[in-house]
């Protein structure tokens, strides 16, 4: 970026500032997507030791093809991430690799959605992979810490043939594992084997028959191409949530029961199809510090290939009867954002007229910019924390071929102006008013056209 000193029109001198650097494995977001340097699909969120831990699958650019010859989902390992505030995320690195799975095919790239639970001080990480014997299986890796290191057991769980494991630790003292298209079975106390008293049934696929352990919890429910079951318990009810293809792409649906193994009664949608026709969605639901959250994925960093997905978060609410209110995806997300950080207003709460575009179409991880095309265009970014001390300056990373004036609103309202800066420039200007505490930030264009803003900050 070009470093220059510019003069703010009608105001004091404006100066360039240096962006604050973070360790490579730490990122500050608070907005969606929450991880901005790699793909993080199928996010399973769990609370351990007062922190949120997220165990996603790890999409990479496709290295395998589907049976129809098209590029396909490719996942070779698992990372684990943690956060204490849903804004600052730490990547603890790879915990399981496909080539380290004793029973798995080392080049299958089929490490789909995982899960992790804790029992008696041990952390049990459940993951699918393609078996060397063919077909999918679910393995277990065990650690003394959610961040690892994990020891992979030499054999998968006998009796499970599928992907997307989810383990429910129920109030009846038992643990239940769900997988595939909603199948469920009870686990032994050791958390690594299916219990001996699970029911068995013969399942038919066309001319083929197979004896399966457990029960099909989606029996009789809307479940076309269902996958990714996630089960949890709340206020005496068991919830089985799952993605399925209602028309052409996936929705997130749910059913309720008084018994962890069902039968379940269908209740409706948690989230409708993605507006951009991203084919899949996959999720988890967790209570953290008294608030329920929905973790899910979208292809925000891969608009041209919907098999590279990124984790996002929204707040989730229950009705008095225990049913779930439908969740709308947002760009603002849920994390608290400090005004002293780089505030990416392209992750807006509301927009009028302005456009959101990628900063670099050769590297989508660089994020987005907000383009104020004409006077009157505006964006609002909700819940920005200005702290206890009113900032004296506003910093903008902007690009503009003409001088511009903006109206800034955050509890109070004032205007700032800057000259043309045809290259990306960080401009520091006097804050036009004093404000403190939690405010909704609105930025509107007063004069100028095609003004591009990467981020704003206050100090």
Predicted features and spans:
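Generic cytosolic/nucleocytoplasmic N-terminal low-complexity/intrinsically disordered segments
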Residues: 1-2, 173
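Sec-dependent signal peptide recognition
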Residues: 2-8
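Hydrophobic h-region of N-terminal signal peptides that target proteins for export
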Residues: 9-17
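Carbohydrate-active catalytic/glycan-binding domains of CAZyme proteins
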Residues: 16-459
């Amino acid at each position: 970026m070009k470093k220059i000193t510019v003069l703010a029109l009608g105001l004091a001198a404006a100066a360039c500032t240096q962006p604050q650097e973070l360790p490579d494995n730490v990122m500050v977001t608070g907005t969606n997507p929450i991880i901005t340097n790699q793909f993080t699909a199928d996010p399973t969120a769990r609370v351990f030791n007062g922190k949120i831990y997220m165990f996603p699958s790890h999409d990479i650019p496709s290295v395998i093809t589907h049976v129809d010859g098209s590029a396909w989902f490719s996942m070779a390992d698992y990372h684990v991430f943690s956060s204490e505030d849903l804004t600052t995320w730490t990547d603890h690195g790879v915990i399981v690799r496909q080539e380290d799975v004793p029973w798995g095919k080392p080049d299958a790239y089929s490490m789909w959605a995982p899960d992790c639970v804790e029992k008696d001080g041990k952390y049990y990480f459940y993951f699918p992979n393609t078996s060397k014997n063919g077909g999918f299986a679910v393995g277990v890796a065990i650690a003394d810490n959610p961040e690892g290191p994990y020891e992979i057991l030499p054999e998968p769980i006998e009796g499970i043939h599928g992907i997307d494991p989810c383990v429910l630790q129920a109030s009846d003292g038992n643990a239940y594992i769900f997988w595939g298209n909603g199948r469920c079975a009870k686990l032994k106390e050791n958390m690594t084997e299916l219990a001996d008293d699970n029911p068995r049934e013969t399942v038919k696929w066309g001319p083929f028959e197979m004896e399966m352990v457990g029960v099909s919890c989606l029996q009789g429910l809307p479940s076309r191409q269902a996958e990714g079951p996630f089960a949890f318990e709340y206020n005496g009810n068991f919830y089985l949530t799952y993605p399925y293809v209602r028309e052409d792409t996936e929705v997130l649906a749910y059913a309720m029961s008084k018994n962890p193994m069902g039968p379940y009664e269908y209740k409706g949608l948690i989230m409708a199809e993605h507006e951009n026709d991203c084919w899949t969605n996959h999720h988890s639901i967790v209570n953290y510090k008294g608030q329920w959250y929905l973790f899910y994925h979208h292809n925000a960093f891969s608009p041209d290939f919907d098999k590279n997905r990124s984790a996002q978060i929204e707040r989730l609410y229950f009705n008095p009867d225990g049913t779930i209110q439908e969740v709308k995806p947002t760009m603002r997300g849920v994390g608290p954002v400090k005004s002293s950080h780089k505030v990416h207003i392209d992750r807006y709460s509301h927009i009028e007229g302005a456009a959101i575009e990628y900063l670099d179409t050769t590297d989508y991880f660089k994020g987005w910019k907000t383009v104020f095309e004409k006077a009157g265009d505006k964006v609002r970014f909700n819940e920005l924390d200005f702290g206890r001390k009113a900032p004296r300056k506003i910093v903008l990373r902007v690009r503009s071929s003409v001088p511009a004036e903006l109206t800034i609103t955050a509890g109070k309202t004032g205007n700032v102006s800057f000259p043309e800066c045809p290259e990306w420039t960080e401009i520091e200007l006097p804050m036009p008013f004093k404000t403190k505490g939690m405010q909704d930030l609105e930025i509107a264009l007063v004069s100028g056209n095609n003004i591009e803003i990467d981020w704003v900050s206050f100090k």
